Design a protein with these regions (language model features):
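Bacterial Sec-dependent N-terminal signal peptides
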Residues: 24-50
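First exposed extracellular module after export/assembly in secreted or surface-exposed proteins
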Residues: 43-273
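Sec-dependent bacterial lipoprotein signal peptides
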Residues: 1-34
């Protein structure tokens, strides 16, 4: 009987020791899992900047760049501090900060700015879009005669609403006339006269930055006036004559419209009427 009691005591002791070891092992494993999850936790960085490829139109010749904007409305007069760096094989855009005005009276819109990349040769460039040199986003910038494209591996702190921008062809003009019904005859006369300087034409489907062209339909991106009138007509044409020859026609039409309408025309070289 004494021998049986000893056996039971040894069994109970062994069972307790095994249970203790098993419990310690579970705690260690559980602790490791928690530590591991903490190590791979992803920090959610607020997306304050919107950035997309852009063609900067100029009379001296267009060049590629980026259009950068805040994702939220900012005080009027806010600016974006941008530091671009371009080499033979690399492009770096460092978004430093929003520079606020001394006083904030209105927050009517997002703040926008462009940064130039110069005359890039066709090919692929290693791209970095960074926030204060702390948050680093890597990708590729591809340049061709007709398009500028961006592919990113990460987009921490930024959004890229448009990844491909097509170049605006030489001789292209586009715009909008908004007017009230009593100006119908004037608008018809302007449209007929415009046809003696330019003709309608089509483009490859895509986003051209300043406008979109899809299935023979032109849609202006929001760069024109937002003034509201009862009627609207859009123009998308290729010049048959020098751009300067349009000046008198456009200015005279604007004068006759007065406060009863608004005419806005932009050209391939950045000139806006």
């Amino acid at each position: 009987m004494h021998r049986n009691i000893c056996k039971k005591m040894r069994f109970n002791t062994q069972t307790k020791i095994f249970g203790l070891i098993f419990s310690i092992a579970l705690l260690i494993i559980g602790g490791c899992k928690r530590d591991g999850s903490e190590q791979i936790k992803v920090i959610d960085i607020k997306k304050e900047f919107s950035i997309q490829p852009w063609e900067i139109l100029k009379e001296s010749g267009s060049e590629y760049g980026f259009l950068i904007a805040s994702t939220e409305k900012k005080c009027d007069g806010t600016k974006i501090r941008i530091v671009p760096l371009v080499s033979q094989s690399d492009v770096s855009i460092n978004l430093q900060a929003f520079i606020n005005p001394d006083s904030c009276f209105n927050t009517t819109d997002v703040v926008r700015d462009t940064t130039k990349l110069g005359l890039l040769s066709n090919g692929s460039y290693a791209l970095q879009i960074n926030l204060k040199d702390v948050v680093l986003n890597s990708g590729t910038l591809s340049v061709s005669d007709t398009k500028l494209s961006v592919q990113m591996q990460s987009t921490d702190g930024i959004t890229i609403p448009v990844t491909d921008i097509l170049r605006v062809p030489q001789g292209t003009i586009w715009g909008t006339i908004k007017y009230n019904t009593d100006q119908e005859n004037l608008v018809t006369a302007f449209s007929d006269s415009l046809k003696t300087y330019a003709h309608n034409f089509s483009l490859v489907n895509g986003n051209y930055g300043y406008f979109q062209f899809i299935d023979n339909s032109y849609t202006p991106n929001p760069t024109a006036t937002t003034t509201t009138f009862t009627k609207q007509k859009t123009y998308f044409m290729r010049l048959d004559k020098p751009l300067k020859s349009l000046t008198n026609l456009i200015q005279n039409t604007k004068t006759q419209l007065g406060k009863n309408g608004n005419l806005w025309i932009m050209a391939y070289n950045g000139v806006t009427f």
